[in-house]
Design a protein with these regions (language model features):
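Charge-rich amphipathic alpha-helical interaction elements
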Residues: 1-137
Length: 137
């Protein structure tokens, strides 16, 4: 019984660790989305500046190539974080099932011990009643 409780504690700790990792990855994904939106806004600002000024227009070609590379890198990182989030969600589901198994085993063990205890009490009461009845005769 003690080992089941220890295993339950470990399973809960693992589940909590996975939940924290998921929260970190979600925060990372949110930060990446903010960076992507900021980068898109910067590209739009540079496009407007390139339309206003001839020199800016000439320099925009190099900037556009670099901006495209940054956009691809951010998109790839966003995708990898999404994959990691999906993986962590699957691990959390598995860890939750495992935790529930230990909880159920503990419940069954406690129910079994309760039945044994009630049987012992009933046997003791029956013995006392038999002894009492024997004394009356």
């Amino acid at each position: 019984m003690k080992s089941l409780r220890t295993l339950l504690k470990l399973a809960r700790r693992d589940l909590e660790t996975l939940r924290r990792a998921l929260a970190e990855q979600i925060a990372r994904q949110t930060a990446l989305q903010d960076r992507i939106l900021g980068h898109e806004q910067t590209i739009k600002d540079e496009q407007r500046a390139a339309l206003r000024d001839y020199e800016s227009g000439r320099a925009y070609g190099g900037y556009a190539a670099a901006a495209l590379a940054v956009r691809r890198a951010l998109a790839a990182e966003h995708e990898s974080v999404g994959v990691e989030i999906d993986r962590l969600r699957a691990l959390i589901a598995e860890a939750h099932v495992e935790t529930r198994k230990f909880e159920r085993l503990i419940e069954l063990e406690e129910a079994r011990l309760k039945v044994q205890r009630e049987k012992r009490e009933d046997a003791a009461l029956d013995e006392m009643a038999t002894m009492r009845l024997g004394r009356r005769r």
